[in-house]
């Protein structure tokens, strides 16, 4: 049995950077989870939490409806680091004073340390650039605390109570704009909380193989294989754990990209030698989607049909007990927690029928996408799969806006093939989180030759991201955009216009539906 790993908990107060804090902790090879602020204090004790980080948040601590945590958390003896709102809440709940400032402090500021040798601040020097984003400020620290650092406009930028191991920083150490932010977080993890740094790809694989074997026993397992990164790596990991007890089912739902079904079958049958059942269910899915335009309804239909189909295949195979899914942490977070509204139902999370007959195996439920890729590389999954851009479970069904038809799918496949081909030629594919095309449910007037046309526009979408929780649109070179647009309107029938989506996330999502 493997040793229990260290656990750091990020308490989510609705801050936009909560997931980023968790990523920074994991980058230091310490396991981290995001919990809602409403989690009972007893849960921390039972989980053996090594350290707690309070996230920032959009509220003012003085608001009546501002998120609060049970003050009993300070009596657990577990080290706590409060960030921005988290520091203000800590100060207020422990008897300090927080006031609305005359002016906010946003952007870079110079932090001046009162104690550069303090375990939390070791290695920073006397001054360091930090990133501020606040209006409220701590004006008096609680009893037992001392001021460890200040900026020109913030008298209490760092505070600490060494006896109780309670600390707060008014700035955001998790963002890249704070020059030595990662050092501060590492100091908290290792100098204050005493973490070992035992969260590695290899330790994850070892632990998951043990857990999967224990969960499955002598049972039989089905894997929902799409050919994407998550399901592919999940299949290889589960196969490592249970071998021939695993059967992979690859469903061609008619919503795949060009040439994708053939590539998936070749890769997993020939390269991995995994038992693979290939089901061509395109007619079944497209008939169910006929006339459906609402994106949420499309996602639910596709999710339901997947499970029903697996149940059909399970009956053919005999007794099947478990279903593997490549659900990742952002899927779980985006599908709703107590501090975040549901943005959209994720195919791997919210689209499952209530009467599902399988027990789920979700080995990557607590991993970010880059961590899944690292697991894949360690397991020997080919780079052409590990390095692939994320593809939604419902496939092109949520990239064809409105009703999904065979004609629209063919248009989108050809446009997408050209776009990705040109992105690869330009050497940009690996720089991007995703690059894909969208077919809106509208037509526009155009002129081709001497004739008026009334055809579809195609939307190009290319974004950079670390984990899909936030994303920036990519500034593609103009000459590349021009070449892509020219090829699409000339080579793809029924398209007369190409547009480029320059929306980041937030306010938009990466996918259009």
From Swiss-Prot:
UniProt entry keywords in alphabetical sequence: ATP-binding, Glutamine amidotransferase, GMP biosynthesis, Ligase, Nucleotide-binding, Purine biosynthesis
**Alphabetical list of PROSITE patterns matching this protein:** GATASE_TYPE_1 (PS51273), GMPS_ATP_PPASE (PS51553)
Cite the EC number: 6.3.5.2
- An example Gene Ontology cellular component term from the record? cytosol
Catalysed reaction(s) here are:
XMP + L-glutamine + ATP + H2O = GMP + L-glutamate + AMP + diphosphate + 2 H(+)
Q: Which residues form the Glutamine amidotransferase type-1 domain?
A: 7-198
GO MF term (any one): ATP binding
> Which Gene3D superfamilies does the annotation name?
3.30.300.10, 3.40.50.880, HUPs
Say which domain of life the source belongs to: Bacteria
Q: Which InterPro entries match?
A: Class_I_gatase-like, GATASE, GMP_synth_C, GMP_synth_GATase, GMP_synthase, GMPS_ATP_PPase_dom, Rossmann-like_a/b/a_fold
- Pathway per the UniProt entry: Purine metabolism; GMP biosynthesis; GMP from XMP (L-Gln route): step 1/1
Q: Where is the active site?
A: 84 (nucleophile), 172, 174
* Subunit structure comment from the entry: Homodimer.
- Task performed by this protein: Catalyzes the synthesis of GMP from XMP.
Q: What is this protein called?
A: GMP synthase [glutamine-hydrolyzing]
What is the source species?
Symbiobacterium thermophilum (strain DSM 24528 / JCM 14929 / IAM 14863 / T)
């Amino acid at each position: 049995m493997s040793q229990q790993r260290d656990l750091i908990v990020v308490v989510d107060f609705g801050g936009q950077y909560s997931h980023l804090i968790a990523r920074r902790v994991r980058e230091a090879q310490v396991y981290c989870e995001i919990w809602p602020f409403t989690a009972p204090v007893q849960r921390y004790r039972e989980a053996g939490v090594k350290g707690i980080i309070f996230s920032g948040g959009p509220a003012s601590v003085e608001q009546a409806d501002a998120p609060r945590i049970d003050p009993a958390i300070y009596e657990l003896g577990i080290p706590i680091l409060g960030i921005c709102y988290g520091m203000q809440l800590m100060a207020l709940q422990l008897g300090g004073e927080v006031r609305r400032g005359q002016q906010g402090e946003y952007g870079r500021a110079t932090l001046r340390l009162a104690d550069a040798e303090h375990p939390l601040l070791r290695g920073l020097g006397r001054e360091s650039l930090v990133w501020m984003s606040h209006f409220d400020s701590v004006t008096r620290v609680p009893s037992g605390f001392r001021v460890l650092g200040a900026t020109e406009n913030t008298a209490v930028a760092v505070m600490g109570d060494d006896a109780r191991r309670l600390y707060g920083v008014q700035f955001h150490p998790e963002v890249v704009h704070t020059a030595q932010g990662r050092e501060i977080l590492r100091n908290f993890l290792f100098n204050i909380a005493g973490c070992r740094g035992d969260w590695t790809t290899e330790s994850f694989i070892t632990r998951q193989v043990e857990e999967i074997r224990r969960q499955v026993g002598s049972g039989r397992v089905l894997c929902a294989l799409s050919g994407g990164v998550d399901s592919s790596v999940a299949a290889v990991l589960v196969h490592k754990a249970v071998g021939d007890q695993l059967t992979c089912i690859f469903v061609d739902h008619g919503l795949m990209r060009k040439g994708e079904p053939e590539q998936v079958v070749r890769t997993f049958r020939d390269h991995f030698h995994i038992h693979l059942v290939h089901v061509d269910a395109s007619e079944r899915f497209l008939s169910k989607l006929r006339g459906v335009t609402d994106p949420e309804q499309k996602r639910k239909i596709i999710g339901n049909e997947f499970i029903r189909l697996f149940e059909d295949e399970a009956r053919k195979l005999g007794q099947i007990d478990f279903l593997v899914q490549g659900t990742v942490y952002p899927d779980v977070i985006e599908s709703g927690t107590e501090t975040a509204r549901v943005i959209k139902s994720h195919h791997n999370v919210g689209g499952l029928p209530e009467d599902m007959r399988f027990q789920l195996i979700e080995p990557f439920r607590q991993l970010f996408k880059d961590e899944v890729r690292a697991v894949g590389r360690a397991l020997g999954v080919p780079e052409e799969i590990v390095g692939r851009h994320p593809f939604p479970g419902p496939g092109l069904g949520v990239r064809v806006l409105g009703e999904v038809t065979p004609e629209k799918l063919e248009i989108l496949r050809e446009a997408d093939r050209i776009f990705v081909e040109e992105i690869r030629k330009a050497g940009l594919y690996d720089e991007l989180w995703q690059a894909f095309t969208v077919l809106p449910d509208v037509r526009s007037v155009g002129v081709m030759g001497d004739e008026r046309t009334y055809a579809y526009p195609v939307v190009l979408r290319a974004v950079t991201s670390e984990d899909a929780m936030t994303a920036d649109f990519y500034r593609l070179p103009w000459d590349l955009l021009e070449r892509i647009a020219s090829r699409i309107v000339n080579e793809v029938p029924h398209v007369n216009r190409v547009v480029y989506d320059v929306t980041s996330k937030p306010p938009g999502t990466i996918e259009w539906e």
